[in-house]
């Protein structure tokens, strides 16, 4: 039950990020697209080091984990709506419907691929061998560490796109 509440913090962070960034325009959108993956990276790195540690489950032990989860959601909420708009704007008038429909397809594919990759990383990270508490701790470390690469990649792409846009 507690794990479900913790996972909901990402959704709450996403909502807060979307509300914060909903009224942005111009350069502020560029910043939101860059700050989003930075938040995601910080949250993932936080989870990389916080989750594998033994916790008593007390509120104060969970607060940093809660903040890291909310930070990941905040990052998605800041950047994602503006990225969707960019996809639709980049499509020609004849391809607008196709672009809109493909967004959902890409989201579903990314979710399925991410779940499969998470399972592979967790298993390779020790979830099964050595297993037990030690294996779970080790798997959590590798899982969040490997998945921290995704927002790092997002930062690089956002910076390159911003630099390209400025040079055009």
Segment roles from a protein language model:
Residues 1-128, 133-165:
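12-transmembrane solute porter fold
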């Amino acid at each position: 039950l507690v794990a479900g509440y913790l996972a909901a913090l990402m959704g709450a962070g996403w909502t807060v990020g979307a509300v914060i960034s909903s009224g942005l325009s111009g350069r502020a959108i560029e910043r939101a697209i860059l700050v989003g993956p930075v938040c995601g990276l910080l949250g993932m790195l936080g989870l990389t080091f916080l989750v594998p540690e033994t916790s008593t489950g007390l509120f104060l032990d969970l607060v940093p984990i809660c903040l890291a989860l909310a930070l990941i959601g905040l990052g998605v909420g800041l950047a994602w709506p503006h990225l969707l708009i960019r996809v639709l704007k980049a499509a020609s008038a004849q391809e607008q419907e196709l672009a809109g429909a493909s967004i959902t397809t890409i989201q579903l594919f990314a979710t399925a691929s991410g779940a499969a990759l998470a399972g592979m990383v967790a298993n390779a990270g020790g979830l099964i061998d050595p297993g037990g508490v030690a294996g779970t701790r080790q798997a959590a470390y590798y899982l969040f560490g490997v998945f921290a690469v995704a927002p790092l990649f997002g930062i690089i792409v956002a910076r390159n796109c911003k630099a390209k846009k400025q040079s055009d």
